[in-house]
Amino acid sequence: MAQRIFTLILLLCSTSVFAGLFDAPGRSHFVPADQAFAFDFQQNQHDLNLTWQIKDGYYLYRKQIRITPEHAKIADVQLPQGVWHEDEFYGKSEIYRDRLTLPVTINQASAGATLTVTYQGCADAGFCYPPETKTVPLSEVVANNAASQPVSVPQQEQHTAQLPFSALWALLIGIGIAFTPCVLPMYPLISGIVLGGKQRLSTARALLLTFIYVQGMALTYTALGLVVAAAGLQFQAALQHPYVLIGLAIVFTLLAMSMFGLFTLQLPSSLQTHLTLMSNRQQGGSPGGVFVMGAIAGLICSPCTTAPLSAILLYIAQSGNMWLGGGMLYLYALGMGLPLMLITVFGNRLLPKSGPWMEQVKTAFGFVILALPIFLLERVIGDIWGLRLWSALGVAFFGWAFITSLQAKRGWMRVVQIILLAAALVSVRPLQDWAFGATHTAQTQTHLNFTQIKTVDELNQALVEAKGKPVMLDLYADWCVACKKFEKYTFSDPQVQKALADTVLLQANVTANDAQDVALLKHLNVLGLPTILFFDGQGQEHPQARVTGFMDAETFSAHLRDRQP
């Protein structure tokens, strides 16, 4: 008897295993969103805990979590740090796995108040769910005196994370600014003033006084960074508006033009004179006097330092990050002060000779500043035009560097010239494709010609108009990574296009996830994307042919041969 039961169990297991082995490759093995991201909440007076139990093999996007109160006031919601996840289309993003607990402090809630929670996630296997929205009913909460102003979850964190420069760049920029024609010749004079004209100070004493001077200058710059970052944080949403981004890009361009020598940008001469007189009244050689001199020097901007400093300040305002703001300006001042410290200790023998090269350093920083408006405009004009602007900047910079290097007499500069010329030729490729239409022609040849639909009625009408032909419906969204992989790798394949030559191709873009999109997905019983459906000539779907998840061109071609009606 026991042997028969054991044999029966083996047969049942074998059946399930073979069913899994020979299951359709496109059949869905993904769970509904509520099972992938089990959401729950618990409120205790002012304290509300939102929890997500995330199924193994799935993850939530940190930047897609939004919390909106209705008839309630909540404190600032601090999203915990996630783990970094990278894909080829969206780059690095922070995600949550396993479990997420999000505490929310409710300052006040009226009767009938609610909290709308929106989130979105994907599966590691290449399947993304539409944004999920949950409504959390709130118990009535009376405001207390300590209640803070209501704010919403910061939604601009992804912009901060994507800023193109780190604080270390500020240190390098500060060092570079030290070698511009407005700054470098002043260092011997500043060194003498800092030491109070005393030539017999010990090396340690001279280094200490110079360090104190640099710290005074750094204090001024750090304070500027903190103030600007705090102001940027208050107006963070406004600073992301397209008109504001365009305005900032124009300002950055003007700052770069000043570095090219088109005009001079500096503080009014009367203010500079007043600050200089204040500095001269300080006693050189004493720590207190030297510190004040450095702090005042931070306010006296020369024509060579005004534009880079203004660019960094505007950059910090965009970030709204006070730690970044203070840190960048501190490192910027430290970079400017390092050559001064070396000159004070070792003398002028370390100081390079003045010459035209200092103007070239200033011009090079103009190109660095020009990178910032392109970074800002990419959010407005898109990746394609952004690439063209980067191409134009690269051609301009490498072309200028090549022409400048022709003045050099040393033999090894010929190698540098060849490298610069090659870099310019590589940089011009996106502009060449744009001018001669190569990219457009390639896209025309490699992309399927889909007919777009939006609603259930439009789908039904398209099925009727197919007139007996088989129909393929592709459900697409910008937030679906695998959908973009389908476009780039699968739909561009000649074998796939040939197999679909006699098929009516429909596509529904559900990026907005509005009411019509939700209704369409519900009508088709679609859990997430990518999902591709196949209909026969009578407009009836073939459920066994449905594709969920990514397929490469070879697998999809085989699926079309085996499954398509």
Swiss-Prot record:
| Disulfide-bonded cysteines | 122-128, 182-304, 480-483
What Enzyme Commission number(s) appear in the record?
A: 1.8.1.8
At the top of the EC hierarchy, this enzyme's class is: oxidoreductase
Keyword vocabulary terms for this entry: Cell inner membrane, Cell membrane, Cytochrome c-type biogenesis, Disulfide bond, Electron transport, Membrane, NAD, Oxidoreductase, Redox-active center, Signal, Transmembrane, Transmembrane helix, Transport
Recorded catalytic reaction(s): these are: [protein]-dithiol + NAD(+) = [protein]-disulfide + NADH + H(+); [protein]-dithiol + NADP(+) = [protein]-disulfide + NADPH + H(+)
The subcellular localization recorded is: Cell inner membrane
Q: Which InterPro entries does the record match to this protein?
A: Cyt_c_assmbl_TM_dom, DsbD_gamma, DsbDN, DsbDN_sf, Thiol_diS_interchange_DbsD, Thioredoxin-like_fold, Thioredoxin-like_sf, Thioredoxin_CS
Q: Where does the record place the Thioredoxin domain?
A: 434-565
Protein name, UniProt field: Thiol:disulfide interchange protein DsbD
What is the species of this protein? Answer: Shigella sonnei (strain Ss046)
Chain's gene name: dsbD
